[in-house]
Amino acid sequence: MSKGPAVGIDLGTTYSCVGVFQHGKVEIIANDQGNRTTPSYVAFTDTERLIGDAAKNQVAMNPTNTVFDAKRLIGRRFDDAVVQSDMKHWPFMVVNDAGRPKVQVEYKGETKSFYPEEVSSMVLTKMKEIAEAYLGKTVTNAVVTVPAYFNDSQRQATKDAGTIAGLNVLRIINEPTAAAIAYGLDKKVGAERNVLIFDLGGGTFDVSILTIEDGIFEVKSTAGDTHLGGEDFDNRMVNHFIAEFKRKHKKDISENKRAVRRLRTACERAKRTLSSSTQASIEIDSLYEGIDFYTSITRARFEELNADLFRGTLDPVEKALRDAKLDKSQIHDIVLVGGSTRIPKIQKLLQDFFNGKELNKSINPDEAVAYGAAVQAAILSGDKSENVQDLLLLDVTPLSLGIETAGGVMTVLIKRNTTIPTKQTQTFTTYSDNQPGVLIQVYEGERAMTKDNNLLGKFELTGIPPAPRGVPQIEVTFDIDANGILNVSAVDKSTGKENKITITNDKGRLSKEDIERMVQEAEKYKAEDEKQRDKVSSKNSLESYAFNMKATVEDEKLQGKINDEDKQKILDKCNEIISWLDKNQTAEKEEFEHQQKELEKVCNPIITKLYQSAGGMPGGMPGGFPGGGAPPSGGASSGPTIEEVD
């Protein structure tokens, strides 16, 4: 096989994950079971050795020979307090070999013992094979991640595990660093950033605070609980149902290992369901002594069962902040890692603790670490081809970008958090007859009206040939390159005439703090904005209707089809409405709607009559373009003269 690219491997306590950077993006690779994460489990049976899903699936039948949690042993001495306390909970045996721990199992009928590095190397081998099966190439180079608090011997042992697995470990990087790289936080411009990584996995909970400056990462503090994770939440649910079974059936299933195991599997599934639904049902046939167990649990009950554990996740956050000598307001970014951070309650507690700050969660939390490791692997293996240097570290546009349209409305072309580079084009038109030019004003921000957003720059496109309103087509293109530089161009489709502006991201752009603030304000103002948007839209719709109606009855195609009295009736009413609009630019939505009803009352009967007599109008209705009109000049809102076209 040919040599494949470098991969990133997240070697986790309970699950591992592998990713590769190719074709300009990171791909997280699924295993042969179609799962994008693989259990860090190795099982030994009379006939074979199983790794991953196969190992975890048979743990109930073969508990003493199924090894997991090797990460809790790696690089530690046998008499380490951690090893001694963990040993009590494991079904497999840990023995002392000259001061080093080894796991002892029965394999093919004989007793074998393995160092933690060997067990981890088996998991790494599996991850390597998963990547090779997907890529169809040999994989040797890898970046492997470890917790930030790992000491030198733990790091070295992890590297050794890689070597045993036949990998050339390019670098060992910290899990929180990898997660920050996944979100491209090291590529954001400006002064140093403080990033808090909240990593709640299957069996461990780690909080890390990093500072990033000029692409250099420094771990400021770490805190957490090495024995808190998804499994604990499962246990609470298991105990809840054991108690329920006792109440319902007067039987205690807690001593029956198989029953408890089946219940635990069902609980883990229910827990996952509760992250997206508010209720989950559990159905287990013949759980115990032939009794079928059918029950359900609500999200609220699940949250209540784990209330203390969920709340307790904030203690390490506070400790990490204290150790880093930072106030929570000084944290620029919060990154969620680990499957348990999908739990809505945990997200809410964390977001509330940080006063409503947005959390970085767009990358699958189980995969964020492997994602960042894959990016790092591509960089370290000198991937110049895809220009990973420039391209990646997944930069996004922090704020929406758009232009001002009729009535001072912000029309967004690029939504916030769009991955860059990106390019968007939209067509606009004029709002008054024979309008010679348009003013393109570029804004960033989340508000509905441009006056509440930040003006980045503006330019004019002139020399538009005389034409009725709504006829010219002006194509506006927003193009952001990998360095965040924005090019905005406008082209008049009829003449091909073009003008453009380049906006670089340093000057005139907002600071990170401003961005945070604006995003938060935007939430608060969303309701007001909706109202304002509705108002402008009902005003535009009334205006359009009046102008179009006027144009329709004045059209020469209708000469002789409409009697003068009807025509005058419509024109008078239209002119009355147009002059009312001039005086009442800031009226309420209801007033615009009322005026439109009045206008329709006059026009509809006449137009209907017209249609019936003409059997449909020749050439269809002239005028009438979507998006509605704009305030006539001199209106209170003297927005720029361009109009959105669907």
From Swiss-Prot:
Residues that the record marks as modified (N6,N6-dimethyllysine) are 561
Query: Which of the residues bear the PTM Omega-N-methylarginine?
Result: 469
One GO biological-process annotation of the entry reads: G1/S transition of mitotic cell cycle
Any idea which positions bind ATP? 12-15, 71, 202-204, 268-275, 339-342
Q: Which InterPro entries match?
A: ATPase_NBD, Heat_shock_70_CS, HSP70_C_sf, HSP70_peptide-bd_sf, Hsp_70_fam
Q: Which UniProt keywords are listed? A: Acetylation, ATP-binding, Autophagy, Cell membrane, Chaperone, Cytoplasm, Hydrolase, Isopeptide bond, Lysosome, Membrane, Methylation, mRNA processing, mRNA splicing, Nucleotide-binding, Nucleus, Phosphoprotein, Repressor, Spliceosome, Stress response, Transcription, Transcription regulation, Ubl conjugation
The Gene Ontology terms for molecular function here are:
A1 adenosine receptor binding; ADP binding; ATP binding; ATP hydrolysis activity; ATP-dependent protein disaggregase activity; ATP-dependent protein folding chaperone; C3HC4-type RING finger domain binding; clathrin-uncoating ATPase activity
Q: Where is this region: Substrate-binding domain (SBD)?
A: 394-509
Give Gene Ontology CC terms: asymmetric synapse; autophagosome; axon; cell surface; cytoplasm; cytosol; dendrite; dendritic shaft
Modification sites for N-acetylserine: 2
Which SUPFAM superfamilies does the annotation name?
Actin-like ATPase domain (SSF53067), Heat shock protein 70kD (HSP70), C-terminal subdomain (SSF100934), Heat shock protein 70kD (HSP70), peptide-binding domain (SSF100920)
Instruction: Specify the cross-link site (Glycyl lysine isopeptide (Lys-Gly) (interchain with G-Cter in SUMO1)).
Output: 512
Post-translation changes: Acetylated.
| Induction (record text) | Constitutively synthesized.
EC assignment: the record states 3.6.4.10
| N6-acetyllysine found at | 108, 246, 319, 328, 512, 524, 589, 597, 601
Q: Where does ADP bind?
A: 14-15, 202, 268, 271, 275, 339
Region (Disordered), start-end ranges: 614-646
Function noted in UniProt = Molecular chaperone implicated in a wide variety of cellular processes, including protection of the proteome from stress, folding and transport of newly synthesized polypeptides, chaperone-mediated autophagy, activation of proteolysis of misfolded proteins, formation and dissociation of protein complexes, and antigen presentation. Plays a pivotal role in the protein quality control system, ensuring the correct folding of proteins, the re-folding of misfolded proteins and controlling the targeting of proteins for subsequent degradation.
How does the annotation summarize its subunit structure? Answer: Component of the chaperone-assisted selective autophagy (CASA) complex consisting of BAG3, HSPA8/HSC70, HSPB8 and STUB1/CHIP. Identified in a IGF2BP1-dependent mRNP granule complex containing untranslated mRNAs. Interacts with PACRG. Interacts with HSPH1/HSP105. Interacts with IRAK1BP1 and BAG1. Interacts with DNAJC7. Interacts with DNAJB12 (via J domain). Interacts with DNAJB14 (via J domain). Interacts (via C-terminus) with the E3 ligase STUB1 forming a 210 kDa complex of one STUB1 and two HSPA8 molecules.
Q: What is known of its domains?
A: The N-terminal nucleotide binding domain (NBD) (also known as the ATPase domain) is responsible for binding and hydrolyzing ATP. The C-terminal substrate-binding domain (SBD) (also known as peptide-binding domain) binds to the client/substrate proteins. The two domains are allosterically coupled so that, when ATP is bound to the NBD, the SBD binds relatively weakly to clients. When ADP is bound in the NBD, a conformational change enhances the affinity of the SBD for client proteins.
Name-wise, this protein is Heat shock cognate 71 kDa protein
Species source reads Rattus norvegicus (Rat)
Q: Which gene encodes it?
A: Hspa8
